[in-house]
Amino acid sequence: MRSCWRDIGLDPNIYVGIVTGAGPAFCAGRDVKFLAQYQAQGKRTPHEDPNDPLFHWGGGGQPQDVNLEKPLIAAINGFAVGVGLNIILQCQLRVMADGAWIGDQHTNVGRLGAPHEMYSALPRTAAAYLTLCNGRLTAQECLQQAIVNKVVPAEQLMAAAEQLAEMICLGSPLAVQAAIRLYRLTASFPPSLSAYARHLDQEIAESEDGAEGARAFKEKRPPAWKLR
């Protein structure tokens, strides 16, 4: 996906992007079973191993990874968890199908994820509910908390997103891109915080509980936490 974000940023004929899922989910996040296979061997996944060529690609490419300065609209067609939720939060405008929901399952599988991004982009109580309780927020709950701009029936989702895109295209591209830069700056946090979050997540991943979380998910059973 990183190449998609880069193409949007470089193409002068693209003013705005719409991000949606191709199936029942907007994005299901990381493959935890894949993670469990690596952890069972005492290894890091390629994206977490500094010695692996794929390490610099991060979690698969998010808009913030290429400093995209064009507006994005999330057309949330289904459930979005983990990295899927992070991508939504990096879209300035969001339209949600009435049957969709968002959630964060990281602590359920012994990981941390990027809660600082949620604390920055969401109402703090909503972010805490998602990150600490592994809770879910329905489309109507997201609308009530101003996490999304609009909730529509699934069959009207893309039309609603395209309507927002058309409104954006009426404005000056230079002014819109400047507004996006300010949007990102006012919602940003110091790089040291992201680095600290990655450090904590990796520390947890290499613990016994980190391996147990992924293993329990793969075996479809409740995890047995050991606090180590």
What are these regions (language model features)?
Residues 52-54, 130, 182:
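Alpha-helical linker/hinge and terminal dimerization helices associated
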Residues 11-17, 174-177:
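Short beta-strand/loop segment at the start of cytosolic alpha/beta domains
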Residues 2-11, 32-77, 114-115, 195:
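An acidic, glycine-rich surface segment that forms the CoA-thioester-binding/catalytic face
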Residues 16-24:
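Short, glycine-/small-residue-enriched flexible loop/hinge segments at domain edges that mediate gating
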Residues 26, 38, 46-47, 134-140, ...:
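C-terminal alpha-helix plus adjacent terminal tail
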Residues 1, 19, 31, 88, ...:
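Terminal peptide-recognition signature
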Residues 24-28, 33, 81:
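Short, active-site-adjacent cap segments at secondary-structure transitions
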Residues 7, 63-174, 206-207, 211-215, ...:
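Crotonase-fold acyl-CoA enzyme core
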